[in-house]
Amino acid sequence: LKNDDAKGALYELVEEADIFIQNFRPGTAERLDVDYDTLTDHNEDLIYLAISAFGQTGPWRERSGYDLLIQGMSGIMSVTGEADRQPVKVGLPMTDLITAMWAAFGATTALYRRERTGEGEYIDLGMLEATLPWLTKQAGMVFAGEETKRMGTKDPVLAPYQTFETKDGFINICILNEKLWGELCEALDRPDLPEDDRFEQNADRVEHLDELEAEIEATLADKTTDEWIEVIAEDAGVPAGPVYSVEEALNSPQIEARGTVTEIEHPELGEVPVIEHPLKFRNAESGFELPPPLLGEHNREVFRERGYSEAEIDRLAELGVFGDDAEDGDTDD
């Protein structure tokens, strides 16, 4: 984008575009002449989405940011991990994914609004602000004047709602009300637990979490995870499940039955396993029609659609408009 020919080509693409997304630090788009005001000179109905670590305003606006930083600065790490250990990062790029979902939601909402009003839109999305709404329970505690802290897999307001150790592994048990608590105790053959003053009501159990955990794990140690799943989840109908590895999750019978993992044909890698689109529409097709494109695979196709000749596309490629490492696309058709 420091090349005038590249900018000219981009402006022509923008003329027919619905949505333009950039994730530069604030100020960079202006320096490159791809800011909202510049691009809307070429398409006044454009939906422009600017993603950054901390948004376009505020004292941190010019800072760079990545998932680890945002997990720390959003408070996620302060409530993740065991109480007596250091803060822990969630084991996936959570804030990247959260921000991407907000971006998709914002862009499609703006597109729908444009269909009704004819107006384009400028959307300012910061990773930190995108993440905070997901801390619903913890934010509510802060607003109520309560302290948030790391609790491992325990829940600050529900008990038992955590991971327990079994004879050969781990099991998650989720008790949301007194009915389920009674059914769990019956499944565990522990009628004494509901009669114990420490465990009678949810508030009592939250107050005595450590003692509750010790009592339940003493019983769970007698059987394997699979055995307890049958007793607790299948027979008693109490919410409970195993702690799978990623491989076990991808190969579970439920995922197999839903056709969630499938294969696509990649032009260089052959058959490649992928996780399918999770939204299963009744009246519309969803899922993968094509494999992910190679870098620059559709350059020529896109510029042909804009009326460029092969000679003009060749010239852009020679000038480096498509990038040093990108293919310039198929020249056979």
Regions of interest found by a model, annotated:
Residues 1-41, 221:
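A structured beta-alpha segment of the ubiquitous adenosine-cofactor-binding alpha/beta core
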Residues 12, 120-128, 197, 231, ...:
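Beta-strand segments within the central parallel beta-sheet cores of soluble alpha/beta enzyme folds
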Residues 30-171, 175-176:
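Active-site-adjacent "lid/gating" segments in soluble enzymes
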Residues 159-236, 240, 253:
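Aromatic-enriched alpha-helical interface/lid elements that frame and gate functional surfaces
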Residues 234-289:
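A glycine-rich dinucleotide-binding beta-alpha-beta segment and adjacent secondary-structure elements
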Residues 269-315:
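Flexible, small-/acidic-enriched active-site or ligand-binding loops
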Residues 311-333:
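Amphipathic terminal alpha-helices
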